[in-house]
């Protein structure tokens, strides 16, 4: 996959990533920012918009905003502290809530497009 400079896709994704990073910087709670990102990803993926704008929002904004590595670091700390129940609860809840958030974003976008 090459960089699509001709259609400004590279620059649009970079702009989305910049905005996503700023948004992520303002939200300190990993769980919340990941749920918001999942909701937005489901919403944006369901919109009938040009591919380059969808890439801007999904890859740039949502990709930059969500924090898989921060979440893994948080889980590792829970394990090191011996908080096994909290580790398991956190692991399961973010996965289940993330899928639910994507589904809700998808449903919301479809209702707006109807």
Curated annotation (Swiss-Prot):
It catalyses: fluoride(in) = fluoride(out). GO terms for molecular function: fluoride channel activity; metal ion binding. Pfam families: CRCB (PF02537). It is a multi-pass membrane protein. Coiled coil: none annotated. GO terms for cellular component: plasma membrane. It comes from the Bacteria. Disulfide bonds: none annotated. Keywords: Cell inner membrane, Cell membrane, Ion channel, Ion transport, Membrane, Metal-binding, Sodium, Transmembrane, Transmembrane helix, Transport. InterPro entries: FluC. Na(+) is not transported, but it plays an essential structural role and its presence is essential for fluoride channel function. It is found in: Cell inner membrane. The keyword Ion transport applies. The chain crosses the membrane at residues 3-23, 30-50, 55-75, 87-107. Na(+) binds at residues 63, 66. Belongs to the fluoride channel Fluc/FEX (TC 1.A.43) family. Fluoride-specific ion channel. Important for reducing fluoride concentration in the cell, thus reducing its toxicity. This is Fluoride-specific ion channel FluC 1.
């Amino acid at each position: 996959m090459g960089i699509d400079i001709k259609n400004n896709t590279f620059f649009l994704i970079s702009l989305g990533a910049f905005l996503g990073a700023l948004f992520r910087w303002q939200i300190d709670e990993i769980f919340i920012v990941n749920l918001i990102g999942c909701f937005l990803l489901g919403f944006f993926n369901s919109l009938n918009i040009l591919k380059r704008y969808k890439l801007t929002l999904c890859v740039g904004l949502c990709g930059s905003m969500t924090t898989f590595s921060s979440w893994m670091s948080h889980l590792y700390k829970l394990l090191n502290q011996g908080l096994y129940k909290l580790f398991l609860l956190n692991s399961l809840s973010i996965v289940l809530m993330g899928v639910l958030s994507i589904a809700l974003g998808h449903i919301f976008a479809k209702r707006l497009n109807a």
